[in-house]
Swiss-Prot record:
GO terms for biological process: translation. GO terms for molecular function: RNA binding; rRNA binding; structural constituent of ribosome. It comes from Saccharolobus solfataricus (strain ATCC 35092 / DSM 1617 / JCM 11322 / P2). SUPFAM superfamilies: Ribosomal protein L4 (SSF52166). This is Large ribosomal subunit protein uL4. Belongs to the universal ribosomal protein uL4 family. One of the primary rRNA binding proteins, this protein initially binds near the 5'-end of the 23S rRNA. It is important during the early stages of 50S assembly. It makes multiple contacts with different domains of the 23S rRNA in the assembled 50S subunit and ribosome. Forms part of the polypeptide exit tunnel. Pfam families: Ribosomal_L4. The keyword Translocase does not apply.
Length: 267
């Protein structure tokens, strides 16, 4: 079965939100969105970032507790001498774990190189579809057309206030406000482990230069990420394996993505 793909068109906006011209997008923005592939590759990339963990083999076993035996009218759990306090067993306070985590456990999932490439293309295609972006929960003005492509000079924005003003002019700052309002304290022990707050995902800005001033300028805006087009992956484009992140491209980043992906997939 062959799919006939039609190239999409998009407006190029300047940093004031004015339409400069219309351009034809690379074919990678017209591919069908493969949710199954995006999920598979997301899990593979995410699990490769996990660190193996284990437990001290003697944890919970540093005690002289032994069972008192039978026919005493009490449970046969190991007990500390002279106190009768239960210890060592998995169902006791301070006892060992029945099945502790092992450093030998295989955490990382695998995916093929071609699957990874096609998953990135699928995720890019979803950013060009307003239905996927809305389904992800992003908020923006009704006048916004997808994908959002802007001129290269936006990478020279040096202050957070300039980036904030730029996002307002292109109609996506409401999404930053949504993230701000929904930052909340995490449930559970993660609060004690350096992960106190949970922050929703906001807009993604894809640039063509890793030394762009906008990278530092935008990092203080809630939920906003700035990534080089050479490094962008499913992790950035489809957080949680949910495609359709609100994404802003610079004109040159589109060309880099085209060179990186089109030649290897489209024959």
């Amino acid at each position: 079965m062959y799919l006939e793909l039609v190239k999409k068109k998009s407006d190029i906006l300047d940093k004031d939100g004015n339409r400069i011209k219309e351009v034809e997008l690379p074919i990678i923005f017209s591919f069908p969105v493969r949710k199954d592939l995006i999920r598979r590759v997301f899990i593979a990339e995410f699990t490769h970032s996990l660190q193996p963990k284990g437990r001290d083999p003697n944890a919970g076993k540093r005690t002289s507790a032994e069972s008192f035996g039978i026919n005493l009218g009490m449970a046969r759990v190991p007990r500390v001498k002279n106190s009768g306090e239960a210890a060592l067993a998995p169902n006791t306070v301070g006892g060992r774990l029945a099945f502790p985590p092992s450093v030998n456990k295989k955490l990382a999932e695998e995916a093929n190189v071609k699957e990874k490439r096609l998953a990135v293309i699928s995720a890019l295609s979803a950013t060009a579809d307003i239905a996927f972006v809305r389904a992800r929960g992003h908020v923006f003005k009704d006048s916004v057309r997808f994908p959002i492509v802007v001129t290269d000079d936006i990478v020279n924005l040096k202050t957070t206030s300039e980036v904030e003003e730029f996002l307002k002019k292109i109609g996506v700052y409401d999404d930053v406000e949504r993230v701000k309002e929904r930052i909340r304290i995490r449930a559970g022990k993660g609060k004690m482990r350096g992960r106190k707050y949970k922050e929703p995902i906001g807009p993604l800005i894809i640039v063509h230069d890793s030394n762009s001033p906008i990278i530092k300028a935008a990092r203080n805006l809630a939920g906003v990420d700035v990534v080089n087009a050479k490094d962008v992956s499913v992790i950035h484009l489809a957080p949680g394996a949910h495609p359709g992140r609100l994404t802003i491209y610079t004109e040159s980043s589109i060309k880099i993505l085209d060179e990186r992906l089109s030649k290897r997939v489209v024959s």
